[in-house]
């Protein structure tokens, strides 16, 4: 069935035309993918334990929480192209800081990293809305997600492997090379020639858009569901390498689990087809349920690491089902004249996840052992299961 769905994509001329644009998301993601498992492990080395890693990531997120809301203001002062270039440049500078061996420079690098990732997500969402017709978004979104997370499937293991077996500096050099490749691909696609009218970037204090956003039930639902999904992945990315390292499995095994769990996204075209065939609501309900049950089982078997990591991989399958929806709930709900302002607010789900997950676990890990994180993750995924029932049946 999966091959039939993929073949169906390749035979659809309308979708095939946008494959180069979907591939752009692979290139954009390379810089952060190769450092994905390196960063929590380096943080663990610098601060000493998982609870302090949580505190560090929480403080970094506090510094970056306003980034998404400031993007429309930044775009008004520059334009879409320059905003994207600022994001890419910030990524390159952040890598240089992250390479150093001191805590203060690592913290500065993490703040810049949060800024670059968040602002780039906003820019790319705007480019998607400019380039892809609304009726083709449900078909394009799984391709976009596959392109981005193929990089996330390869990068975590490759980065740790190169750092441990070849040279400590090599993953950081690859990350910087990824920013250069992003700029080259950006111009090859002709995205530098695309623009948005200044009025589309909104005006005034971006904080005032929060009220407008959350007064719209469909936007509120889209934000809540993607927040729960993003929070689970945040837990998976940060704490899986730490759990593997502290349980005796080793850093490379932890990075491999992150890569394998992310590799489930190769099935995204199937889940996109499933959502169109049986409804997005059913897909998300099923994904949240699988992730909830498997996360609970990981906690139960956390004392047997080899069993726990297998269960964790299957929990990632549930989260991947949710990725099959992409940003469709938001993209179909947002008003065209408000897309810049509402995109800035919507993208705060990443900042809130970056803030809430380490903050929540910093408190839990003060009193409990590391496996408690899996109960926490199961808890909010259960909430997502309940919220998914509010997705309109026609979707």
Predicted feature locations:
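Helix-loop boundary and gating motifs at the non-cytosolic
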Residues: 8-61, 218-257
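Cytoplasmic helix-loop-helix junction between adjacent transmembrane helices
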Residues: 113-148
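Symmetry-related core transmembrane helices of the 12-TM Major Facilitator Superfamily/SLC fold
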Residues: 170-187, 374-389
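Juxtamembrane intracellular "pre-TM" segments in multi-pass secondary transporters
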Residues: 2-15, 191-224
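Structural signature of the two symmetry-related core transmembrane helices
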Residues: 82-96, 176, 282-296
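Loop-to-transmembrane helix entry/capping segments in MFS-fold secondary transporters
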Residues: 50-51, 134-144, 251, 334-346
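Helix-to-loop junctions at the C-terminal end of transmembrane segments
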Residues: 67-79, 163, 267-280, 365
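A late C-terminal transmembrane helix in Major Facilitator Superfamily
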Residues: 337-366
């Amino acid at each position: 069935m999966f091959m039939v769905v993929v073949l169906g994509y390749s035979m659809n001329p309308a979708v095939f035309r946008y494959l180069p644009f979907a591939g752009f998301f692979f290139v954009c993601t390379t810089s952060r993918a190769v450092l994905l498992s390196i960063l929590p492990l380096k943080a663990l080395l610098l601060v000493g334990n998982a609870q302090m890693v949580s505190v560090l990531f929480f403080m970094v997120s506090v510094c970056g929480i306003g980034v998404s809301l400031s993007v429309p203001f930044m775009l008004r002062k520059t334009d879409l192209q320059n905003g994207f270039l600022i994001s890419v440049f910030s990524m390159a500078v952040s890598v240089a800081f992250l390479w150093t061996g001191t805590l203060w420079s690592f913290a500065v690098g993490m703040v810049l990293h949060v800024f670059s990732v968040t602002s780039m997500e906003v820019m790319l969402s705007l480019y998607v809305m400019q380039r892809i017709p609304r009726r083709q978004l449900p078909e394009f979104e799984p391709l976009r997600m596959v392109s981005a997370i193929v990089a996330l499937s390869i990068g975590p293991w490759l980065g740790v492997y190169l750092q441990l077996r070849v040279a400590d500096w090599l993953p950081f050099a690859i990350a910087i090379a990824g920013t250069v490749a992003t700029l080259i691909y950006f111009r090859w696609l002709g995205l530098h020639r695309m623009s948005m009218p200044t009025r589309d970037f909104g005006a005034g204090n971006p904080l005032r858009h929060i009220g407008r956003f959350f007064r719209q039930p469909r936007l509120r639902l889209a934000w809540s569901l993607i927040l729960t999904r993003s929070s689970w992945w945040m837990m998976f990315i940060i704490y899986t390498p730490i759990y593997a390292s502290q349980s005796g499995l080793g850093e490379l095994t932890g990075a491999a689990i992150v890569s394998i769990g992310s590799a489930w996204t190769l099935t995204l075209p199937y889940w996109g087809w499933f959502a169109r065939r049986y409804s997005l609501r059913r897909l998300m309900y099923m994904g949240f349920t699988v992730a909830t049950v498997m996360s609970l089982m990981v906690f139960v078997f956390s004392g047997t690491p080899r069993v726990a990591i297998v269960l964790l991989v299957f929990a990632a399958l549930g989260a991947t089902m949710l990725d099959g929806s992409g940003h469709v709930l938001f993209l179909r709900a947002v008003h065209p004249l408000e897309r810049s302002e509402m995109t800035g607010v919507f993208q705060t789900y990443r900042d809130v996840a970056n803030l809430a997950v380490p903050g929540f676990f910093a408190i839990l890990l003060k009193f409990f052992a590391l496996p408690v994180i899996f109960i926490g993750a199961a808890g909010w995924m259960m909430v997502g299961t309940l919220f998914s029932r509010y997705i309109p049946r026609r979707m």
